[in-house]
Amino acid sequence: MALRLGLFLIWAGVSMFLQLDPVNGDEQLSEDNVILPKEKKDPASGAETKDNKCVFPFIYGNKKYFDCTLHGSLFLWCSLDADYTGRWKYCTKNDYAKCVFPFIYEGKSYDTCIIIGSTFMNYWCSLSSNYDEDGVWKYC
């Protein structure tokens, strides 16, 4: 067996070996020459599903989530059911919670993003129909 020249990388607790070139020159690269990390299964070891859409809000561990969460994971994820049953997926840029219109803020209804109440004078919106009750928001 020829000595293998390569890089051993460690990033975020995941290690992998990437072979640079076969040392003896006649050996071809194959999947056997690369050690890949095991499949990630974070949120309470449920099954990751990629085809479905995130459901917001969802309840996980007696807490209501209005957007993707890091709870129990190194990566943002969401539930595929309103009450988490083990079906989940990692969030992509298209999965994050959307603004809810109209929403109530300080007893008044708004149909667009607002700057009122913003410390940094940026437009924001509520992630629920009633900001006064839930207090969840994001910048627009």
Curated annotation (Swiss-Prot):
Pfam families on file: fn2
Fibronectin type-II domain segment(s): 49-93, 94-140
GO cellular component, one term: cell surface
UniProtKB keywords: Disulfide bond, Fertilization, Repeat, Secreted, Signal
Listed GO MF terms: heparin binding
CDD domains recorded: FN2
Localization in the cell: Secreted
One Gene Ontology term from the biological process aspect of the record: phospholipid efflux
Disulfide feature: 54-78, 68-91, 99-125, 113-140
Function: The BSP-A proteins from seminal plasma exhibit both simulatory and inhibitory actions on the release of pituitary gonadotropins. The exact function of these proteins is not known.
Family membership noted in the UniProt record: Belongs to the seminal plasma protein family.
Protein name per the record: Seminal plasma protein A3
